[in-house]
Amino acid sequence: QKLNVENIDCRIDGAEIGKHGRAGYIFNSKINGIDEADALLIVGSNPKIEAPVLNARIRKRYLQGNFPIALIGENNNLTYPFNYMGSNSIDIKKLRDKNHETYKILMDAERPMIIVGMGALTNGSGPAILHELRELGELFGVIKKDWNGFNVLHTSAGRTGALDVGCLPSKKGLSAKQIFSESENSNISFIWLIGVDNKEVLNLK
């Protein structure tokens, strides 16, 4: 704002987050929350690659028992068994089916957890997916007075801090994707990259 710049964005990968409160973009339960959770749904994330320490914690919790895990997204080897529900956003709707196994598991859990990754939030359906998962979180008790197991897993280390200080476009400003597009069309002549080495900027000229 002091520089009079409206086109500012820390969401280089296009994730449409940060507009609906801090709880909508942080790992609310912290990594220690894995130890308290009794059911887990992973959406659009491969924690084995994106967060190995977190993945090891999930595996440790699984080995302790009574910790069913479901996955929506790419079907990867995560080092622990899980119920694979599919890879499309439409598969999230299955969680509203009262006869679905994962619905019953999450509904019966005392401290269910959802981990949503950038794989679910960096496409055009990201806002709708996040909204749907928040609603499901409230339905299953993922979000309640004494427990918040709704967690967003970032693939960029500085993203949370940048969102905290408001590195988002103004109402008239352009998003990162729009900035890159306008740059390619020569409508933007200068882009200041601060701590950015994402693949999305490698082809900038």
Regions found by a protein language model. Name each.
Residues 1-205:
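Catalytic alpha/large subunits of respiratory electron-transfer oxidoreductases
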